[in-house]
A protein has these predicted regions:
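Charged interaction scaffolds used for protein-protein
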Residues: 1-14, 18-44, 48-84
Length: 84
């Protein structure tokens, strides 16, 4: 599954797209399966995926996840796409 996430901070707004690697990182960290997303996921889940996808796309983010989260003003799912 690919998610397009809109990330907003006090300074900027941008969109990132997750990939399989980001989803696997999320599964490992939170001990959940991608199929669990159908039942709904939390804001921290979205923030984690946005953080990892940002790093993969060479968007400069803080070294620590919590610092990244503190800087967020909003995060939302713009689009979803099932991986074939």
């Amino acid at each position: 599954m690919k998610l397009t996430l809109k990330v907003e901070t006090a300074d900027t707004a941008y969109e990132v797209v997750t990939n399989l690697y980001v989803i696997i990182l999320w599964e490992r960290k939170y001990k959940r399966k991608a199929s669990d997303m159908a039942a709904g996921i939390g804001v921290e889940d979205l923030a984690f995926m946005a953080y990892e996808a940002s790093k993969l796309n060479k968007i400069v983010v803080p070294a620590e996840f919590d610092t990244f989260v503190k800087g967020l003003t909003n995060i939302e799912v713009v689009d979803t796409e099932a991986v074939n």
